Amino acid sequence: MRCLGCGRFCLRLLCATCQNILSSYTLKSRLVDGLEVFYFYAYSEISALLSTKHKLCGSGVFKALCQLSISRFAQSFYLPDVPLIHAIALDDNVKSGYSHSAIIAKALKNAQISPLPNALKAMSEVKYAGKSLEYRQKNPRNFKLLKPLKAPVILVDDIITTGLSMKEAKECVQSAGGEVLFGIVLADARE
């Protein structure tokens, strides 16, 4: 088997060298319509790994990426005076046998953060991959909140490009009376 990061022979999806490189991320953030969205990698650094989300090995790749980044963030994250926070994936529909955004939300689980599965659904089946900002604006995701919120929310996705999905999800949660603390993704497509 070959490492999906560098192509070297290894018995895992990612070799030890690639794991070391990916675990030395710098947490950055981007402001989207007043919402701070944290990310771990530039899209250009992990685009080949993210493209596996529609393949059989994708669930393993996303779990490995999350162990190296999101889970480590969750281990050290604590917000005083907030007993519970929900991690909500943007449209965690099962595609290709699993939901990549649900894997990311699950990686955030700690004593304070609890994933809330199947809470936010895109009512539109539009695909944004490779589409322009104009196309995205004309074809909204039309998110719908399917579960009542009992705690503040962290919005979760794999990539942030224009920020429209995060903005639309934030508006959906807020219109239902929920509070969005921030968003978190693996990669920023602008880098």
Language model features with spans:
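Short cysteine-rich clusters marking metal-coordination/redox-active sites
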Residues: 3-6, 15-18
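Cys/His-rich microdomains that often coordinate metals
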Residues: 10-11, 22
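Glycine-rich phosphate-binding loops at beta-strand->alpha-helix junctions
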Residues: 89-101
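Short helix-loop-beta junction
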Residues: 106-114
